[in-house]
């Protein structure tokens, strides 16, 4: 499962609240914080980071429980907990404010961070983001229910199955980054347990709790959505746009993984967002 595609930057780590959080950082300029979803990692941004790093300070962390970050079984790994950890990461990297872009559950982290700590967010970008009660998707709900049984199966089974499902519509180079994201789950019982804990933490109550507060966001916001997204249906996109004052929306010819499927278009959208004030 090793990828031939190198990451856009080598991983470094920060110690935050007793946790080791891995991140990739490249470039100089105004900070852009890129947040991945499930079951990916900072490798989601392999084809977005290099271009943006030509003009920006690009930071892509592995959320707790993902990638090369710690995978604790005794800590809260919900999207709210992830959002609460982001200011500490920004402090460690000496970043006051950033343009924050989140994909999938990373979009929930970005929404919650913007609502709770608006002084840390200069602009908000949401890419095929979970929102309101759009999640967990049925496949993840089924996996949550089956977690006790899945936990007894050979560890490699779930990651092989995930890879085969998710890579169907991805270009070859994106498949390599997907496999690199999945490869960190080293197919041992401990990492399988950590992955299932991430799945069990998927809970729409976190985004539902801040839905009314989206109307208080007063930074430039932009929503990008794959018009053929099978996991977060495109119907959610205009609802999310309309909930955030002044937000704009762009539908692209893509499935769920726009950063892998249409990286050039996404880079253009992020650059346009970063130019707004």
Task: Label the predicted regions.
Residues 158-173, 180-186, 197-204:
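Helix-loop "lid/cap" segments that line or gate small-molecule binding pockets
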Residues 19-68:
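Conserved HGGG/HGGXW glycine-rich cap/lid loop of the alpha/beta-hydrolase fold
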Residues 16, 59-102, 268:
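Active-site loop/oxyanion-hole signature of alpha/beta-hydrolase fold enzymes
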Residues 102, 106, 110:
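Gly/Ala-rich beta-loop-alpha elbow adjacent to hydrolase catalytic centers
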Residues 1-32, 53-56, 95-97, 245, ...:
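Alpha/beta-hydrolase fold catalytic core
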Residues 188-242, 253:
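Conserved serine/cysteine hydrolase catalytic core
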């Amino acid at each position: 499962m090793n990828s031939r595609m190198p990451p856009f930057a080598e991983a470094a780590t920060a110690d935050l609240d007793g946790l080791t959080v891995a991140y990739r950082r490249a470039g100089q300029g105004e900070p852009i914080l890129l947040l991945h979803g499930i079951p990916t990692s900072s490798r989601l941004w392999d084809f977005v980071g290099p271009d943006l790093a030509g003009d920006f300070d690009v930071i892509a962390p592995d959320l707790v429980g993902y990638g090369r970050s710690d995978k604790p079984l005794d800590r809260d790994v919900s999207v709210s907990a992830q959002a609460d950890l982001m200011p500490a990461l920004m402090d460690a990297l000496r970043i006051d404010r950033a343009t924050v872009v989140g994909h999938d559950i990373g979009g929930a982290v970005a929404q919650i961070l913007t609502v709770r700590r608006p002084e840390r967010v200069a602009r908000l970008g949401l890419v095929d983001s979970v929102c309101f009660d759009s999640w967990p998707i049925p496949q993840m709900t089924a996996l949550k229910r089956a977690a006790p049984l899945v936990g007894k199966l050979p560890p490699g089974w779930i990651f092989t199955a995930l890879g085969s499902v998710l890579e169907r519509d991805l270009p070859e180079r994106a498949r390599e980054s997907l496999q690199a994201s999945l490869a960190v789950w080293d197919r041992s019982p401990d990492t399988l347990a950590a992955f299932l804990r991430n799945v069990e933490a998927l809970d729409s109550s976190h985004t539902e709790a801040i839905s009314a507060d989206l109307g208080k966001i007063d930074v430039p916001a932009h929503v990008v959505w794959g018009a053929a997204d099978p996991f977060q249906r495109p119907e959610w996109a205009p609802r999310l746009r309309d909930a955030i004052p002044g937000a704009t929306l762009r539908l692209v010819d893509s499935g769920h993984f726009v950063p892998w499927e249409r990286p050039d278009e996404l880079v253009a959208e992020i650059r346009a967002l970063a130019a707004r004030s």
